[in-house]
A protein has these predicted regions:
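Acidic-basic catalytic patches of nuclease active cores, encompassing PD-(D/E)XK
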Residues: 1-27, 103
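Residues at secondary-structure transition points
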Residues: 3, 7, 32, 59, ...
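Secondary-structure boundary/capping motif
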Residues: 20-21, 46, 108-113
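Active-site donor-binding loop signature of nucleotide-sugar glycosyltransferases
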Residues: 28, 50-52, 112
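Mg2+/Mn2+-dependent nuclease catalytic core
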Residues: 53-78, 82
Length: 131
């Protein structure tokens, strides 16, 4: 399974680079957890979690969600603490792959995957004039 995950991270790196992202690092680890891919999308620093499943196991693997938010944010904070260039927006993406054989896969890229994990606070509105 580790080999499958490594192949999925390589495929994700290639996918992101073909879409104009600059991949800074793969497989970054700290005590809080791992960040599969760190990249930039224009001025935004993007932390990407990669999940993979063999086609024989069924459809796309589930990406992370609200339950993983704390772990991912803690790992991102540790990453930012170790690196100089931190004055930029940050985003969390998910990439899920279903692999068919040695060289084929379906890939799903969920941009800003943790945006749904932010609780809706009643009465929280934008100031007038802000859209």
């Amino acid at each position: 399974m580790k080999d499958l995950k490594e192949r999925a991270i390589k495929a994700t790196k290639l996918f992101l680079e073909r879409r104009g992202y600059e991949v800074i690092e793969t497989g970054w680890e700290c005590p809080a957890g791992a960040i599969d891919v760190v990249a930039t999308d224009d001025e935004t620093l993007v932390f990407v979690e990669v999940s993979v499943r063999d086609a024989a196991e069924g459809g796309f693997p589930e990406g992370s969600g609200p339950k993983d938010r704390g772990r991912r944010e803690t790992a991102a904070i540790a990453y930012l603490a170790e690196h100089e260039d931190v004055d930029r927006p940050v985003r969390f993406d998910d990439v899920s792959l279903v692999v068919f054989g040695e060289s084929k896969a379906f890939l799903r890229h969920h941009i800003n995957a943790l945006s749904d994990a932010i609780p809706d606070i009643a009465g929280n509105t934008l100031p007038s004039g802000v859209a």
